[in-house]
A protein has these predicted regions:
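Conserved RNAP core-binding helix
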Residues: 8-9, 27-28, 47-69, 183
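Hydrophobic-face residues of short alpha-helical interaction/recognition segments
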Residues: 34, 38, 42, 63, ...
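Amphipathic alpha-helical segment used for protein-protein interaction
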Residues: 34, 113-160, 170
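Structural recognition of an alpha-helix C-terminal capping motif at a helix-to-coil junction
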Residues: 54-61, 76-88
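Arg/Lys-rich amphipathic alpha helix in sigma70-family domain 2
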Residues: 69, 87-108, 112-116, 140, ...
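A short, charge-rich alpha-helical start-of-domain segment used by transcription regulators
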Residues: 2, 6, 14-39
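Short, small-hydrophobic-rich alpha-helical interface motif
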Residues: 15, 34, 38, 55-63, ...
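DNA-recognition helix of helix-turn-helix
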Residues: 147-150, 158, 164-167, 172-203
Length: 210
């Protein structure tokens, strides 16, 4: 099995040898994952005003502009770097559009400088969509409120780890890179968050078998 370090080196070498064509190909390879990130983290108030494809196009232009800086010092895997730039474009988009909407009290929360924070509401909404059957559609608001309240009590970084692992589908190594923590810490936080989530779900009769 190919190790992450090997894949990292191969992508860097491919970029150095292939130029803009290689960059376009590699961005395309990672595009589905980047699109999933934008879809999950885009503020719902911007639906209809901001298109996911526009975010990705802007991210690609910024990647093209800064690729040499990355190649001069490729300290993180290519995908993590692409994700950082995409998230920064998303942060800038939120700031720009929310400022225009004059909604300072509800401005999207941004933490640690390199990602848009996952809210309890968005995480709960995803879980409700994934875990409830059509026959229980009428109960979803109640489920959503229960989950949101419980997730609000969870450590913010633990909650973010859940998002990175389950919705962005990052590996433990990638989570550690994104959050700037040790791999063991990322793993421990994931286990802790998963146990907490299972406790929340097991304690809710709304998720019992029909």
């Amino acid at each position: 099995m190919q190790q992450p370090e090997d894949s990292h080196r191969e992508e860097v070498e491919r970029l150095r040898m292939g130029g803009s064509e290689a960059l376009a190909e590699l961005f395309s390879i990672h595009q589905d994952r980047l699109e999933r990130i934008v879809q999950y983290r885009l503020d719902p108030r911007l639906y209809g005003r901001v298109d996911v494809s526009d975010i990705l196009q802007e991210a690609y232009l910024e990647v093209s502009r800064r690729i040499q800086d990355y190649l001069d010092q490729p300290s993180v895997p290519l995908f993590i770097w692409l994700r950082q730039i995409t998230n920064q474009i998303l942060i800038d988009t939120h700031r720009r559009h929310l400022a225009k909407m004059r909604d300072a009290n509800q401005e999207v929360r941004i933490h640690r400088g390199n990602y848009v924070n996952a809210s309890s509401l968005s995480l709960a909404a995803q879980l409700v969509g994934n875990l409830t059957s059509p026959s229980r559609a009428a109960m979803r608001d109640e489920i959503l409120n229960q989950l949101r309240a419980a997730l609000d009590e969870m450590d913010e970084l633990d909650r973010e780890v859940l998002v990175l692992r389950h919705f962005e589908e990052l590996s433990n190594n990638e989570v550690a890179e994104v959050l700037g923590i040790q791999k063991s810490a990322a793993s421990n936080r994931y286990v802790r968050a998963l146990k907490r989530l299972r406790t929340i779900l097991d304690g809710s009769s709304l998720f019992s078998p029909e």
